[in-house]
Curated annotation (Swiss-Prot):
Residues binding Mg(2+): 38, 40, 227
Organism of provenance: Danio rerio (Zebrafish)
The keyword Cytoplasm belongs to this UniProt entry's keyword annotation: yes
Gene field: nt5c3
Active-site residues, Swiss-Prot/TrEMBL: 38, 40
EC number: 3.1.3.5
Binding site for substrate: 85, 106, 153-154, 202
Zinc-finger recorded as keyword: no
UniProt-recorded name of the protein: Cytosolic 5'-nucleotidase 3
């Protein structure tokens, strides 16, 4: 096993299986590999020095692009629905309608605010968003070896792209699928494009992107990164999986959810704000 796996944040149910998968990934090398990853709290940090970091949605919620009244409503929605999202006693099916409701209500509020497209870069710059330690190495190495990276996010695509653009890691090998804003000719938000992506319907989104995955039919080796049990379905659109390594970041309710995560993810990283483990695996493969 690798020294990075000795960290106390790392939890592995079946070390032999993990070793087997990693050997398969190493054997396939760069030409067979693709990355499928969530964004909020997976590539970005959950907290810095105990202070929560914003998601793509939170960046807008906390910015001066929305009125205080709107902010209060958005915070109220978060206080109502976030506990449902992470409730260990509810199934994904039970959570599903609540997530749709949350997104629909918050997106409606954002449209009412008539957000302006050209103000987004400033909102990102002024926010406390922070990518996980080791992000440059992660993105740059994948770019260097032309490994496709599919970022699949239930967040706000325009904000997400701006974050990775400002971080200097929006390389040509990166494709973002997310909730993209629809602006009118004056650059004012009028709605959202396409089907809603929320935490628990990524399976449907994955199937809508089969064209992308078909083009990568030789890339049967996958590293999947997520932070929610809903993220496990992100590779459902991949036609021919040979080896898949599922790495899960567990950020909240660690004690209650650890067993569940260990049943589903090959490697669980509890309260880990770094990309150390994925980077060490990529170093072996590439």
């Amino acid at each position: 096993m690798m020294p990075e796996f000795e960290k106390n944040t790392v939890h592995i149910r079946d070390p032999e299986r993990v070793e087997q998968i990693i050997c398969g990934l190493i054997k396939g090398g760069a030409s067979k590999l693709q990355i499928i990853t969530d964004f909020d709290m997976t590539l970005s940090r959950f907290a810095v020095n105990g202070k929560r970091c914003p998601s793509c949605h939170n960046i807008i919620d906390n910015s001066k692009l929305v009125t205080d009244d709107c902010r209060k409503k958005l915070v109220h929605l978060k206080e109502t629905y976030y506990p449902i999202e992470i409730d260990p006693h509810l199934t994904m099916e039970e959570k599903y309608p609540f997530m749709v409701e949350w997104y629909f209500k918050s997106h409606t509020l954002l449209v009412e605010q008539r957000l302006e497209k050209d103000k987004l870069p400033e909102a990102v710059r002024e926010s406390d968003v922070s990518l996980k330690e080791g992000y440059e190495q992660f993105f740059d190495r994948l770019h260097q070896h032309s490994v496709p990276v599919f970022i699949f996010s239930a967040g706000l695509g325009d904000v997400l792209e701006e974050i990775i653009r400002q971080a200097g890691v929006y390389h040509p090998n990166v494709k973002v699928v997310s909730n993209f804003m629809d602006f009118d000719d004056n650059g004012v938000l009028k709605g959202f494009k396409g089907e809603l992506i929320h935490v628990y319907n990524k399976h449907d989104g994955a199937l809508r992107n089969t064209e992308y995955f078909k083009q990568l039919k030789d890339n049967g080796n996958i590293i999947l990164l997520g932070d929610s049990l809903g993220d496990l379905t992100m590779a459902d659109g991949v036609p021919n999986v040979e080896n898949i390594l599922k790495i899960g970041y567990l950020n909240d309710k660690v004690e209650e959810l650890l067993e569940k995560y260990m049943d589903s993810y090959n490697i669980v990283l509890a309260r880990d704000e770094t990309l150390e483990v994925p980077n060490s695996i990529l170093q072996k493969i590439l």
